[in-house]
A protein has these predicted regions:
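N-terminal trafficking/processing presequences and adjacent post-cleavage segments
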Residues: 1-22
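Acidic, low-complexity, intrinsically disordered interaction modules
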Residues: 16-76
């Protein structure tokens, strides 16, 4: 399994899983993964989170690429 870039957006305004992900409570999994910025190809270590949306659990990796600009990654096969 690999973590692949999904989307990015400003703090408080990013759509993931069809919703604004910042409107939900993120629960840490305690895991961290290495990812690469898709534009500048810089390596980052982002935390893996879990969120419940409409009764379904979703996992994602997220962190800041730069001040208040968040990147989101999903685990893919």
């Amino acid at each position: 399994m690999a973590w692949e870039y999904e989307t990015f957006g400003p703090d408080g305004q990013c759509k993931l899983f069809g919703v604004n992900i910042f409107d939900y409570v993120w629960q840490t999994t305690g895991k961290r993964v290495k990812v690469q910025d898709p534009i500048y190809h810089q390596d980052h270590t982002f935390e893996v989170w879990r969120v419940e949306i409409d009764g379904q659990l979703h996992s994602f990796a997220a962190g800041e690429f730069s001040n208040c600009v968040w990147g989101f990654y999903l685990e893919k096969e």
